Amino acid sequence: VAGAARHAAKCLALGFAVAGPRWRDNATMHPDHDTILAATQTWLTRAVIGLNLCPFAKAVHVKNQIRYKISQATTPEALLEDLIAELTLLRDTDPEVVDTTLLVHPDILGDFMDYNDFLDVVDAAVEELELDGILQVASFHPDYQFSGTEPDDIDNFSNRSPYPTLHLIRESSIEQAVQAFPDASDIYETNIQTLRKLGHEGWQKLWQLGSDKA
């Protein structure tokens, strides 16, 4: 759990710490690509943008600069291959075309502790590709839990997503965002206040509105 919090801090600094509904990864369900994509985009539009949990997200969403990659990996090794491919693609792609990537992997690492352990592999991949200072990876999971919290604490929802997800971020985009929003360091606390005020009941009502389209 502590390791997960360390990785989450990267994303929290950007203010992209968002709450996700309690969808759970279940490999036996084998949700199709469209279902996974729709759930992820609904999470983005309602939590990240709709609750203004990330002031920076709306622009890249409107400009269609977010890449959604639904991994079919069923082993950590296959997921690592997808991660390396996506890191390389993001590195080599014009930010005006793809600014950030959400690598969603519904059929692997559904257990949060396994996911947490895999984050060390993620760090090693970034280092091996010599992308330190260029790209970073933040973490989201349906059962995300910060150290020192109870599983159902609303604070944990700041990093809960429909499916296990790795968020690939450009360091340059973080720098630009922080310059554009001088109070960026306060976003995490603001998000926690928003979630606590909303509460579990309010959160559940938010997800009873049906599906969104990207």
Residue ranges and their predicted role:
Residues M29-A214:
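Expand to "…catalyze enediolate/carbanion chemistry for C-C bond making/breaking, isomerization
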